[in-house]
Amino acid sequence: MTQSVLLPPGPFTRRQAQAVTTTYSNITLEDDQGSHFRLVVRDTEGRMVWRAWNFEPDAGEGLNRYIRTSGIRTDTATR
């Protein structure tokens, strides 16, 4: 079984977000303002499931919940 790539429970860095977007095909970095940005989780139809700004106090905790349940790994997306 492949280990999940998750975020820290609070705010997260661009490097941490990029690790997630590289691992999951349905999670993207959006509204990039340079120092801050949103990470967005979408379902298989492309509809937004959850999003959070990287600086929010509980950003990672909320996103991790949806990464676990809705994240589509890039290594399985082509199977």
Curated annotation (Swiss-Prot):
A Pfam family of the record is: DUF905
**Coiled coil feature spans:** none
Q: Where does the secretion signal sit in this chain?
A: none
Q: Which cysteines are joined by disulfide bonds?
A: none
- Recorded family membership: Belongs to the UPF0401 family.
Protein known as: UPF0401 protein YkfF
Q: Which organism is it from?
A: Escherichia coli (strain K12)
Give the taxonomic lineage as stored in the record.
Bacteria, Pseudomonadati, Pseudomonadota, Gammaproteobacteria, Enterobacterales
Gene behind the chain = ykfF
